[in-house]
Amino acid sequence: MKTRITELFGIERPIIQGGMHFVGLAELASAVSNAGGLGLITALTQGSPENLKREVARCREMTDKPFGVNLTFLPSINPPDYPGYIQAIIDGGVKIVETAGNNPQRFMPALKEHGIKVIHKCTSVRHSLKAESIGVDALSVDGFECGGHPGEDDVPNFILLNRAAEALSVPFVASGGMANGRSLAAALALGADGINMRSEEHTSELQSP
């Protein structure tokens, strides 16, 4: 199957593994990538930039397919070493980054300079348009069905995806409540270029033992 997302990321199926804390390790990311989707290592799960470098190297031993890193920018009095994580991504040769949370604009020049494609998670069309304006390559549009994220406007995907398709120029995937092929077909019909899945992949046979 070809969509703008498969062509952008060089994957076989328009399915992205959402970043999940605690389980966003090389085993899950490589399993998703080997199955034709886009697996993601969760940066903050690793605990430090050095650990992220090691996890990226482990993932390369498990797959020769494209995979990426999820990096969530959280408001904090003592924030994680975000510049260090960005440098670890660059040093590890990662070419796809999923960002979430706060605006990633301050890190965009460094990522773009190294040819890294950025997909940013948004929970509204207005935030999606802002992300598009700062140069992200793609978007994950998260409807109210999506768990684990603040900022939803109580707008479900059946409404949100239609609006996103009307307003956005860059490719976008649907996130929230995506579980199987019927979900993918529905998302494509509503204008998305693929889907972002989390819990379903972790609880399926796709997850390596």
Predicted segments, located by residue:
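Active-site entrance/lid segments in N-terminal catalytic domains of soluble metabolic enzymes
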Residues: M1-L168
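Acidic, glycine-rich active-site loops and adjacent beta-strand->loop/helix elements
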Residues: F73, E145, G177-M178, E200
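Glycine-rich adenosine-cofactor-binding loop
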Residues: V170-L184, R198
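Short, glycine/charged-rich "phosphate-handling" switch motifs in NTP-dependent
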Residues: D193
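Conserved small/polar residues in nucleotide/adenosyl-binding loops
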Residues: E200-S208
